Structure formats: structure tokens, C-alpha cells
């Protein structure tokens, strides 16, 4: 059970890493209408990044889209602002994460 729980939380690391790679902000994307690598489900969007880096999906595969729930959790935790269409790291979290 411990291994499963650790893997569940890893999805947040995947999202936060994408946000840092993109200067603190990334599109949420859309996995309900597109397959991985197409339309709004590319690797630079949160849904595409989760599909590839967390779920191990390959280009052209169908994906699930848990972004609305995960975005709300990151907002509640004070890690990222859950905005319409994108997530953005909070200034406070960036400062703590960068060790300043």
C-alpha cells in the first residue's frame, strides 16, 4: 500500500516540475476531446504531461483528464493558482522551492 500511495502523490511532482520548466505557468489542456500529442493534449499542457510522464501513455493514445481535481488540490495547498485554462505557481511556493 505504501508504494501505491507514493505513486499517487508523484503526479503532483510531475505537475509542479512542468510548471517550473515553463516559468511557473502552464495550460491545463484537454484530454476529453483529444488523444495525447494532438490538439489541446500536448506534452506542454498539464493533461498531456500527466498522461506521458505519470501514466506512461504514448502519442496517439487516449488519456484520462484528472486536471480539474488536481488543480483544485494544488490551489488549496497554496502551491498554484487555479485559473481558467491554466495553473500558475504562487510566489510564496516559488520562493520556498527555490530556497530563498
Positions of the model-derived regions?
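Long, low-complexity, charged/polar intrinsically disordered regions in eukaryotic proteins
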Residues: 1-35
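Short, surface-exposed, charged/polar-biased interaction segments
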Residues: 32, 36-37, 91, 95
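A short, conserved structural fragment
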Residues: 71, 75-88
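Amphipathic alpha-helical interaction surfaces
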Residues: 21, 25, 56-57, 76-80
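Short, cationic-aromatic polyanion-contact patches
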Residues: 85-100
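Short, well-structured alpha-helical interface segments that form or flank functional binding sites
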Residues: 7-10, 14, 65-69, 75
